[in-house]
UniProtKB/Swiss-Prot annotation:
Beta toxins bind voltage-independently at site-4 of sodium channels (Nav) and shift the voltage of activation toward more negative potentials thereby affecting sodium channel activation and promoting spontaneous and repetitive firing. Induces immediate paralysis in crickets after injection, with a total paralysis occurring within 15-30 minutes and lasting for 1-2 hours. Is also lethal to vertebrate (chicks) when injected in very high dosages (more that 100 mg/kg). GO terms for cellular component: extracellular region. It holds the Pfam family Toxin_3. Residues 1-19 form the signal peptide. One of its GO terms (biological process) is defense response. SMART domains: Knot1. Disulfide bonds join 31-84, 35-60, 44-65, 48-67. InterPro entries: LCN-type_CS_alpha_beta_dom (IPR044062), Scorpion_toxin-like (IPR003614), Scorpion_toxin-like_sf (IPR036574), Scorpion_toxinL (IPR018218), Scorpion_toxinL/defensin (IPR002061). It comes from the Eukaryota. This is Toxin CsEv3. Belongs to the long (4 C-C) scorpion toxin superfamily. Sodium channel inhibitor family. Beta subfamily. Its main location: secreted. Has the structural arrangement of an alpha-helix connected to antiparallel beta-sheets by disulfide bonds (CS-alpha/beta).
Amino acid sequence: MNSLLMITACLFLIGTVWAKEGYLVNKSTGCKYGCLKLGENEGCDKECKAKNQGGSYGYCYAFACWCEGLPESTPTYPLPNKSCGKK
């Protein structure tokens, strides 16, 4: 019983540590999602937790939305072959 509990705890920790994080990016422009209120930010948290993003938590860092707990399928800044504001 103790072994099963330890294995479950380890798997949970591995999933938490290996979760993707990064700046949310607009797929069409290649730019980060901007924000003004640094730290806890309701807008960033809402965007990160949106169904199409799948994150677990979001906040404003360096005037852009930073997300934690993202699935690998969610793109983060920078996008390959796409520069923000450059054509």
